[in-house]
């Protein structure tokens, strides 16, 4: 597939997601990184977003709950170039009814080449990066070229 470049802004659009068993862990991480998060645009699946906003006071645009389609809503935003980073504390030891949605969200994040943290260590590396607050060029699929080749 042909590639093109997209410039991520200095103020990133960051999606925050956590499975039920990892919501307390994500909340702790968000509290630890609240100062950094305040300068970015935050999105989350419904239950997670409402909990984080209530507990931290951060402005978070909440989708609907993950099992009800929130993961897919975030995936759509990623494919539209409206999400720059995904912090997803998923539970690798428990299956959830919407596992196919989870896999689709992680797949679409990979397709559109956005940074993804699935645990605290990776989230720490991303948030310690000097690129967090800078414009960053990333290669993404050239959808227009893809479409032209298929029609």
Curated annotation (Swiss-Prot):
Residues the entry annotates as binding substrate: 19, 23, 45-48, 65-66, 98
Keyword field contains Iron: no
EC number(s) per entry: 4.2.3.3
GO biological process terms on file: methylglyoxal biosynthetic process
GO molecular function, one term: methylglyoxal synthase activity
GO cellular component: cytosol
SMART domains: MGS
PROSITE patterns per the UniProt record, alphabetical: METHYLGLYOXAL_SYNTH, MGS
Domain MGS-like: 6-151
Keyword terms: Lyase
Family annotation (Gene3D superfamilies): Methylglyoxal synthase-like domain
Catalysed reactions listed for this entry: dihydroxyacetone phosphate = methylglyoxal + phosphate
InterPro entries on file: Methylgl_synth, Methylglyoxal_synth_AS, MGS-like_dom, MGS-like_dom_sf
Catalytic site positions: 71
Assigned protein family: Belongs to the methylglyoxal synthase family.
Function comment: Catalyzes the formation of methylglyoxal from dihydroxyacetone phosphate.
Protein name listed in UniProt: Methylglyoxal synthase
Organism: Vibrio vulnificus (strain YJ016)
Lineage: Bacteria, Pseudomonadati, Pseudomonadota, Gammaproteobacteria, Vibrionales
């Amino acid at each position: 597939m042909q590639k093109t470049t997209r410039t991520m802004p200095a103020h990133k659009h960051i999606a925050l997601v956590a499975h039920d068993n990892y919501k307390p862990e994500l909340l702790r991480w968000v509290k630890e990184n609240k100062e950094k998060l305040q300068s970015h645009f935050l999105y989350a699946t419904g239950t997670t977003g409402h909990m984080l906003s209530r507990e931290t006071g951060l402005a978070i645009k909440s989708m609907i709950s993950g099992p009800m389609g929130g993961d897919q809503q975030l995936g759509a935003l990623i494919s539209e170039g409206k999400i720059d980073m995904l912090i997803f504390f998923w539970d690798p030891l428990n299956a959830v009814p919407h596992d196919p949605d989870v896999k689709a969200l992680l797949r679409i994040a990979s397709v559109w080449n956005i940074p993804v943290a699935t645990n605290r260590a990776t989230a720490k590396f991303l948030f310690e990066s000097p690129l967090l607050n800078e414009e960053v060029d990333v290669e993404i699929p050239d959808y227009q070229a893809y479409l032209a080749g298929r029609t």
